[in-house]
UniProtKB/Swiss-Prot annotation:
Name this protein carries in UniProt: Photosystem II reaction center protein J
Magnesium among keywords: no
Transmembrane feature ranges: 8-28
Superkingdom of origin: Eukaryota
UniProt KW keywords: Chloroplast, Membrane, Photosynthesis, Photosystem II, Plastid, Reaction center, Thylakoid, Transmembrane, Transmembrane helix
Organism: Helianthus annuus (Common sunflower)
Compartments, record wording: Plastid, Chloroplast thylakoid membrane
Membrane-topology annotation of the record: Single-pass membrane protein
GO biological process, alphabetically ordered: photosynthesis
Function, as annotated: One of the components of the core complex of photosystem II (PSII). PSII is a light-driven water:plastoquinone oxidoreductase that uses light energy to abstract electrons from H(2)O, generating O(2) and a proton gradient subsequently used for ATP formation. It consists of a core antenna complex that captures photons, and an electron transfer chain that converts photonic excitation into a charge separation.
Listed HAMAP family: PSII_PsbJ (MF_01305)
Family: Belongs to the PsbJ family.
Gene Ontology CC terms: chloroplast thylakoid membrane; photosystem II reaction center
Length: 40
């Protein structure tokens, strides 16, 4: 955690972005499967 004083490491950005993408895709498919995604 000592490297957070400067630029944010790319692996942290990649991990956060990956989690967000997986979460959004999961919510999208879950909503479509349960019928709630039709309003999106």
């Amino acid at each position: 955690m000592a490297d957070t004083t400067g630029r944010i490491p790319l692996w942290i950005i990649g991990t956060v972005a990956g989690i967000l993408v997986i979460g959004l895709v999961g919510v999208f498919f879950y909503g479509s499967y349960s019928g709630l995604g039709s309003s999106l």
